[in-house]
């Protein structure tokens, strides 16, 4: 059984400085951010959590929101919890250095997303390599890459470039608003070359189904949007299920016991890698 790391996935803001063609987040949700008063409410809520949680932040793009570095990160640095971030890594290195300096060994995971519609792979890898030198030995660093159809042969070269630099390459199959993308036969073979035959949730994101497995989301894991709404998991939120209350109105109430997963897709690997899904390490993927 995996150790369960209590985790919150917090969408700190909606605004994003990229507009990727394959982004499944609707443009109407890629806007907005919390006020200074609302940020204080979030921080006060995190301070009430018992034990050591991991607060993994995403957007939009977190660094595109001025309040992220002005208020959120300094505030989290004062709390006992771990901090992680998902970023497109477009922020200047000077800003990224301050981010690392503020959090120190509280920084747990930095997931940087490589979007080839906006950057050159070699330049991106060079920047990530520089950033890596500032991290504590306990901080994990990974380069995420969406497996966009008709680009996969080129991504084999990108994967090699990343790994030659001693960095971790983390492929993600492309998702749609209704599930996962249906690759053609040629691309399916390339997907396997990029992900491996039966990757674990720490090696690739294949958005599998955990239906029927005992799941601790809503108990020791939940997602939080920029408006303060808490949901047991991403898929539950998509179906408007698993609502846990709102941070800004002091109404969040977590579940007290795990339950069997009832969904056909888990779009994010965080619940599995944080030990929330019992038996997820035994999943075998079909060709």
Show which residues each predicted segment covers.
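Flexible mid-to-C-terminal extensions adjoining Fe-S/redox cofactors in radical SAM and related proteins
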Residues: 1-6, 229-230, 234-287
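Canonical Radical SAM [4Fe-4S] cluster-binding loop centered on the CxxxCxxC motif
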Residues: 3-38
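Core AdoMet radical
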Residues: 7, 27-34, 51-65, 79-94, ...
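Residues immediately within or flanking Cys/His clusters that coordinate Zn2+
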Residues: 13, 17, 212, 263-265
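Cys/His-rich zinc-coordinating "finger/knuckle" motifs
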Residues: 23, 27-31, 222, 240, ...
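Acidic (Asp/Glu)-rich catalytic clusters
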Residues: 45-48, 77, 98-106, 127-136
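Distinct, well-ordered alpha-helical segments
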Residues: 67-74, 92-102, 122-127, 155-158
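Radical SAM enzyme [4Fe-4S]-AdoMet core and its adjacent flexible, acidic
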Residues: 109, 113-231, 240
């Amino acid at each position: 059984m995996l150790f369960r790391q209590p985790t919150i996935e917090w969408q700190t803001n909606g605004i994003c400085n990229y507009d990727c063609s394959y982004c499944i987040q609707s443009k109407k949700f890629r806007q907005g951010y919390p006020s200074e008063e609302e940020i204080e409410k979030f921080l006060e809520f995190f301070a009430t959590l018992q034990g050591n949680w991991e607060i993994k932040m995403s957007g939009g793009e977190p660094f595109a929101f001025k309040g992220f570095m002005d208020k959120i990160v300094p505030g989290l640095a004062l709390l006992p919890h771990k901090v992680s971030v998902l970023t497109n890594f477009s922020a200047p290195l000077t800003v990224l250095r301050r981010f690392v300096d503020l959090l120190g060994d509280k920084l747990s995971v930095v997931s940087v997303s490589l979007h080839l519609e906006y950057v050159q792979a070699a330049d991106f890898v060079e920047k990530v390599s520089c950033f890596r030198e500032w991290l504590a030995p306990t901080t994990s660093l990974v380069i995420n890459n969406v497996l966009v159809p008709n680009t996969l042969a080129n991504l084999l070269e990108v994967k090699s470039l990343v790994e030659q630099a001693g960095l971790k390459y983390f492929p993600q199959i492309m998702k749609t608003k209704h599930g996962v993308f249906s690759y053609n036969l040629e691309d399916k073979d390339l997907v396997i070359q990029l992900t491996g035959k039966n990757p674990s949730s720490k090696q690739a994101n294949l958005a599998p189904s955990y239906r029927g497995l005992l799941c601790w989301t809503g108990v020791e894991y939940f997602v939080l949007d920029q408006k303060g709404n808490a949901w047991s998991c991403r898929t539950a939120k998509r179906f408007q299920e698993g609502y846990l209350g709102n941070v800004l109105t002091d109404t969040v109430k977590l579940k007290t016991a795990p339950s069997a997963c009832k969904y056909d897709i888990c779009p994010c690997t965080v619940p599995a890698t944080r030990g929330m899904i019992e038996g997820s390490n035994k999943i075998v993927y079909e060709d």
